[in-house]
Amino acid sequence: MNANVTVDDAISNVNLLDTLAIPDDLPDIEARALPLLYRSNFDTNFEDRSAFVTGIAKYSEEATRHAQFNDMLSEGLQHAANMYTWRCCSRAVPMAKSNDQPNRTEINEMVVEVLKPEVSKLGSFMRFTLTAIQRFCEEVRRLCHSEKRRDFVSEAYLLTLGRFINMFAVLDELKNMKASIKNDFSTFRRASQFLTAMSDTQAVHDMQNLSMFLATQNKIKDDLKLQMKTIEGYEELLCDVVNICAHMYEHQLYLSPNEKHMFVKVIAFSLFLMDGDAANVAKLDQKKRLSISRLDKIFKTLEVVPLYGDMQIQPFAFVRRSSHYEPSKWPLSDKESDRCHVNIVEKVQSIRSDHESYVTQFAKINNEVAICDRPGNDSENREITSLALSGIQLLCQWSCAVVETISWKLLNPTNPKDNRECPENAEEYERATRYNYSPAEKTALIQIIAMIKGLQSMLGKTESDMSNSTRKCVYVELQAFIHHTINEPLQKAVKHKKDLLASILQSVKDSISDAGNELNRMTDVKGKKKSSAPKGDSANSSSSDIRIPRRTAAPGSTQLYMARTQLESLISDKLCGGKKILRKELDSKTIEKISVFLRKSAHWPALFRLSDSMTEAGELSQLWFREFYLEMTMGQRIQFPIEMSMPWILTDYILSCNEPSLIESALYQLDLYNDAAQYSLFNFNKQFLYDEVEAEVNLCFDQFVYKLSEMVFTHYKQLASCMLLDKRFKAEILRSGTMIRSPSAARFESLLQQRHVQLLGRSVDLNRVVSQRVNMALLKALDAAIWKFESEPLSSIVELDMLIDTNRLCHTLLSDVLHSIAPFDDLFQEANHAVNSPHGRITLHVFWELNYDFVPNFVYNGSTHRFVRARHVFRKTPAREKPPQVGQVYYWGSKSLMAAFMNICNAYSQCIGTQHLKAITRLLHYQGIAVILDELLKMTNRLLNDKIRRHVRNVFNMMPKVCKLPRSDYGSNALLQYYVHHLEAVGKYPELKSEFCQDLRELGNMIVFCQQLEVALGQEEAHDLFLAAAYTGTVPQPPARNAQEQMKQLAKLEDKYSRIHLTEIIDKISPDDGQAAIAKDAELMTKERLCCGLNAFENFLVRIKQMLAADDIWTGGYPTNGVFWIDECVEWYRVYSALQFFLCQPTRDDNEVYAEELFGDSLQWGGLTLITLLGQHRRFEVLDFCYHLHRVNKADGKDEVISGIRLAKMVERIRRFQLLNNQIFIILENQLNENNDDPNERVREFAPPVHPNYANHAARRQ
């Protein structure tokens, strides 16, 4: 190890770890992804048959024919795929409108050029069918020869003949169905005849034959049946085919839905072929070669099967077409059922039970193998092999249930009479898919598909291990069977000179023995050494000494075929070469062992290609293909919309049914598109079909992400709203009979954790794309909340604050499952338009409301510390802009939650108080508050210098120059009369109780708003400091008996909380000094927020005081006595005293409204704040008109009506005004003197007072 590694090199090496692909520990709720890897295929199609020189020649020849038939079957499947995927070209090519059209020749030449390759395929198809029918009939004729009728025919060969019969049925039905093929051929023929391109007689003849071939319905079936009738005894061979297919179907010896359905189609079509000039089926039933009742049950259990793609067929329809069909012999199948033979809703229960049992067993075995760090033994390998086979069989059974249900539904569309949801104008395909399934059926299909895909995925992850275990198990069983089971009858056959039996057994042994020569030699040597032993023990002793190696070597396809075929011939009831039935020459135990081996080995080829077998067993591409229904639209539809597509119908149902148990199955439904794409490319070999699948996937996945994002956002929005909803409130409304339900538990977590969703070869980060959508939804929700606030008065800021808190909590909940979601503050800043603008929308609207509604139209109530809207409005509020229409989910999540929160918010809608101001401080922060206060100062300046100044000047002009305080000797009644007389002109000022009071009210609203805002800001800051105390090292002093004990406890607490003291932690672990300095500055600013004397209200008052000092109208200039004005009416407090005199007068009419009802306490706050800031507080208390009247009346207690004013009522009102004034003065004095740290009193020296007479005398002498 190199010790000279620098820090940079070490960091770069650590960074390289990010490039390592680490498997994600994600929930497995996605189907098996087909890897882009090569696959080994050991199926040689009997190319190596010549290597088995020791085998019976008959079976080698059969293998040769078998290979030829397999090649023809492959070619037939290619023709079937070509015909099924045929799209009409003649509708797309231009057509000549008349014979006189000048470019008609060019058009026809283009038509011929385009259609010629396709027509050549049709010619190949016709020639293939003729060749295949001829070759099939030749083989049937050979097998039905009188000398070969009783000869043994292998099971595999009979199944191959059955596949050929199935191919003929499929090709003929496809030819009948595809009208577009005939249209294209007719177009090509007309165009070619116009061009006289076919002068060759043979070409014309071939064209006529092809035309007749395409035009004749059931041409292939009829030709086949016609030729089969000429073969003597063909019914017996077809009877064998029917019996083997029935046997395979009844004993479930199939591993894919296609095999199962093929067996039934072969049975039906074979019965059709067997029905010739006589009732052959009935005769065979009488001979007990066939059992009609047995076949009747089969047809009843499977009424509809897929023929090809989305083409469906009733197998029993072939039987009905027979000329000698007798309904009485088919009591079950003759009656068509109006219900699907598969009750998918009930079937899902048993499927779920099987799924749980299998998964439990699989997990048990898999865990046992995983924890043992050693190769598996024979028992474990046998168990895993059985498990793999059971898995494929379960996949096949479940897929059959889905496919058969879909097939029955496609063949039996619903109609508007039976289904109210189905509209009258619904298309045929729409009635077969979109409206043809009940919610219970959709749920069952979704669950079964999810179990199919889930089991495929589970098996796919252990495919390599299971394949190795399977090959080891097969190898051991095969070698054990050869050396234990075959050895004894082989030695007996040799001993008793049964040459044919011995040659077959030896051939089987040579075919599949791994170490034949050596083992045979060992057997011979041991047999000679123990010749004296009992006869019955020689074989056992030799076989028991054999040590079979454990190798991962599976037999080849030809090798296994040869062994199985020869073993079948041994236990068959038919002749096997030499006209002998060899079964009689074997004992029952050997026959039983061979039968068990044949049953086991029947599935070995599927296990050898485990991956392909799993794919075929769970292949559900049929749910997407719709070529048959597209053909039926006759060109009106190029493709059906996604609303008619089964994969999207099931996916959309998951997203709309509000069933949490289904949400984890959504990706399994999307995997149906993977099946369709795979089948399009590798089975149909059609790029355009893949392109259509891809186009639908693009659209459906966008819709899936959109709807899933909506579901996720709605769920967590409702959850957040319920969490914030007061519990007592919920309890109260529950008592009243209304219940607000919390959202049911959803299973989004597993789905949203998927980071590598495989779809058409793409890897999609579902978490990221949903996060993007949810980001947009959160942004829209915040935008809607701000829009709602902008369309309502300032009182709705509490609702805005609650909405933002709800969205913040929703974001917090979402961030636990969506890791790519943007920070909430970024989303809020973007919605608030505070990214590129110095002021956000909330700040601007708060100021707008303050300027146009709050300041002119609200009044302050000092008792409740709230602002309420005035009875009479002097300023009309401009119309607010209406918010855009958005769903309720963007506000509170649901209708019930919105009603609940609106009920809560209505309590704050009629006033503006502490909750509103706290909301303003939380939403505007320091920057926004500074902007608001700055604008309020500008409004105050305009109000003082423009409006209030004008009113003050007018009042000064109407007041007497001097208004002394009358002596108390006159009595309170005289004083009232005195003031009424002297202030009569002021009382007649038209704007005194309207505009003047309104302006003072506006000034008071701004001042009180600032004062209340400062209180709310202080409370919020104290709360922030309390929460931050533990992280800033601020530890409260613990209670203790003495100082020493308190210091000990404080030291312990400081040590305890030092672990989360951010500044100390950063000092210790951060190598950057700048970062530590920033942390210290941040902590200092946090701690000193309330300690540095910052006070917005005080600064606001100081700024107003500076505005007042700029104009002498408020102070009357320099007093003539050099001290202050006394009786002169030149100062602001004199104006306010005159105003207060009229405000304190009781009403003279019942319809008259008191000033406090119109202006509240805001008017007094405005006037008294000016008095305080001008330093006229004491003079006002001493020289105020109303106060003087109150003092005198308090002494004499008089009560008279003077000038319509009752003295006692006025004095009572003066007392109340005085109480409120004193409160206001105390608040203002405390605020202004709070930070006055000047210890020296402001003392001013004056000359001694001079008597007025002396002053006048001195003036005359001068």
UniProtKB/Swiss-Prot annotation:
Disruption phenotype: Embryonic lethal with cells differentiating, but failing to become organized. The external hypodermal cells fail to spread over and enclose the embryo, but instead cluster on the dorsal side. In one study, animals are viable and there is defective extension of body wall muscle connections or arms towards the ventral nerve cord. In this same study, double knockout with madd-3 results in severe muscle arm extension defects. One of its GO terms (molecular function) is small GTPase binding. It comes from the Eukaryota. Its main location: cytoplasm. Interacts with gex-3. Required for initial steps of body morphogenesis. May play a role in egg laying and yolk protein clatherin-mediated endocytosis by oocytes during oogenesis. Plays a role in the formation of muscle connections, also called muscle arm extensions, between the body wall and the motor axons in the dorsal and ventral cord. PANTHER family: CYTOPLASMIC FMR1-INTERACTING PROTEIN-RELATED. This is Cytoplasmic FMR1-interacting protein homolog. The gene is gex-2.
